[in-house]
Amino acid sequence: MEQTYQYAWIIPFIPLPVPILIGVGLLLFPTTTKNLRRIWAFPSILLLSIVMIFSINLSIQQIKRSPIYQYVWSWTINNDFSFEFGYLIDPLTSIMSMLITTVGIMVLVYSDNYMAHDQGYLRFFASMSFFSTSMLGLVTSSNLIQIYIFWELVGMCSYLLIGFWFTRPLAANACQKAFVTNRVGDFCLLLGILGFYWITGSFEFRDFFEILKNLIYNNEVNSSFLTLCASLLFTGAVAKSAQFPLHVWLPDAMEGPTPISALIHAATMVAAGIFLVARLLPLFIVIPYIMNFISLIGIITILLGATLALAQKDIKRGLAYSTMSQLGYMMLALGMGSYRSALFHLITHAYSKALLFLGSGSIIHSMETLVGYSPDKSQNMVLMGGLRKHIPSSQISFLLGTLSLCGIPPLACFWSKDEILNDSGFYSPIFAIIVWTAAGLTLFRHFCGNLLTFEGHLNVHFQNYSGNKNTPFYSISLWGKEGSKRINKNYRLFKMKNSQSSSFFSKKTYRSYENLKNGLRPFLNIVHFENKKSYSYPYESDNTMLFPLLVLGSFTLFIGSLGIPFNQELDVLTKWLTPSINLLHQKLNNSIDWYKFFEDSIFSVSIAYFGIFLASFLYKPIYSSFQNFDLTNSFLKIGPKRSISDKIINGLYNWSYNRAYIDTFYTTSLIETLRGLSLLARFFDRRAIDGITNGVGVLSFFLAEGIKYVGGGRISSYLFFYLSCLSIFLLGLYFSFSIVSIVIV
């Protein structure tokens, strides 16, 4: 066991050879590396699988013996300052490592086919492997400086991946928005780290917590300054985990490829903020008011995310706001001191949300066969509908993830979310009301999206918003820009024999132009079953994309059993978290009897089924899902005949669709203000600073011209004039000194 922990430092660096070798290959052998680009999926998955096996071994050791292992190397040592690097292996580290590796492997397998058509295939896998390295380095860090270094690397990787299709203006703006918003949080995090180092003189977590606890107990530190530093640390987590008010980057981050969205939302970037708060929870618990502040931010984020998701037509943006809301649940749980519940929900949400995002990628793939590479069309739920008949495997996986996030038993999120809902009732009745309301809205929104996508008819064949006949076939470039040429509507995109049928591992029927042109095939092939019956409709995804959905669906079904609370022997999660819970001085007895458990869960399940019923009633399939999406036709009414209730509903709809006008507020108050200040600075620079410089030059020019016209062009005259002036100056200077000496005498 000691050797397992001793070599744990290598965990973050195992995936690192992939981006290094890809970079060297592109530098030295660019043609060969590009021609053999598909082979890089295999080493990426293999190396991350090695990390997963290592993480599983560490997790088993911790569940059996519950140790916390820390190893430190001294970097610089003197009397006044010491800086150390090291790694810390505890339950939080092993949980995060398991999430990063398992979700990361599934995303890489999925991406091999999803990104096969893309010119940036090599860049994608290099960035993904470096992303995994950065996140693994973050969760194994033993001090705040290491965390900050890897924190910045995680932000850099997310910037590169969100803006992966950088030739699209929306993607370029989205990555800039994510970068700038996170710079605010990162700067606050750095200030908080420096502030606590000034207080404690240490960056190491264990020394840091112990010193601070003694200082607070002996009343040797200013509580206001302590609260300020803790708030600055928390602000870093707020930005990274998309909590209010620094959440604005998350929906726009959907401009990146769908596999990136799955990894960011499930196990990497947004999970980093939750990880930081969980890691620093022993610090926050002993500081007055900070726990209340954390729970307040969490509850606002829950409600805001649940309401803003209601009117989003983009399937990925709706999931993004859902992630924001679910992260709010975790933050609320940490603010209430429910450490176990927060991490439990982090685990269950990761697999459910990864399943939803990869399922949405399969849906988008099927829509792209009709509308081309245009996110405005392929991700628009208004143009979907009736896909259940065409992509049944993707529909089952998407429904499974939806039901899990809705809290339907016995799926994963039911067990974790129910704990947080019950804990909120003990913490604050007001918080409980808000949480239950937001839970109902979340259930309603998710099931509405499911109905819009899979039920009814394929709306892309019907009328568009303005009432004109929609022509779905366009020539779209690789980067999502719509071309001017329309494809013949009679062109059959798909041909399948009537003797084929659909199965979960159905053979891929959609292949992009690049694949056909270059003859490329997925490097990873999953054995498929032959189908006899065939149809002419949007194709089901390839087996390589369906296999991760199957695995994540299995996790969604069974991962909740990890923390079932009514049997202490079967409660693996509590055994796993025992060292961390002891560090927080919390009670270990989290088990309750069956009767109490079912009594607490009746209300949450009732709300879930009510939300499903309401969504089914309001979003029943009709000719156009656009009318359904606005809930009622009264949303579109104009004029004095509209009732007050219609105006209120329409106002709420606009508020949700326009993201509560928070982006507009930031644009007006910050961006426009900074732009005005920059214009003022430019005016001052050109008119004042440059004006003085240019004015001196112009004055010298005219003075020289005047002197030039005084002279006659003879050097002797110039020399006489110069000596005369010098004589007059010296004579005046002599008389001045004479007068001064007489006055003194």
Curated annotation (Swiss-Prot):
Bilayer topology annotation: Multi-pass membrane protein
One Gene Ontology cellular component annotation held by this UniProt entry: chloroplast thylakoid membrane
Keywords of the record: Chloroplast, Membrane, NAD, NADP, Plastid, Plastoquinone, Quinone, Thylakoid, Translocase, Transmembrane, Transmembrane helix, Transport
Protein name: NAD(P)H-quinone oxidoreductase subunit 5, chloroplastic
InterPro entries found in the cross-reference section: NADH_UbQ_OxRdtase_chlpt_su5_C, NADHpl_OxRdtase_5_subgr, ND/Mrp_TM, NU5C-like, Proton_antipo_N
Species this chain originates from: Jasminum nudiflorum (Winter jasmine)
Pfam hit, one: Proton_antipo_N
Transmembrane segments: 9-29, 39-59, 89-109, 125-145, 147-167, 185-205, 230-250, 258-278, 283-303, 318-338, 396-416, 424-444, 546-566, 602-622, 725-745
Gene behind the chain: ndhF
Record's catalysed reaction(s): a plastoquinone + NADH + (n+1) H(+)(in) = a plastoquinol + NAD(+) + n H(+)(out); a plastoquinone + NADPH + (n+1) H(+)(in) = a plastoquinol + NADP(+) + n H(+)(out)
Major subcellular location class: plastid
Cellular compartment(s): Plastid, Chloroplast thylakoid membrane
Family: Belongs to the complex I subunit 5 family.
An example Gene Ontology molecular-function term: NADH dehydrogenase (ubiquinone) activity
Subunit structure: NDH is composed of at least 16 different subunits, 5 of which are encoded in the nucleus.
Lineage: Eukaryota, Viridiplantae, Streptophyta, Embryophyta, Tracheophyta
GO biological process: ATP synthesis coupled electron transport; electron transport coupled proton transport
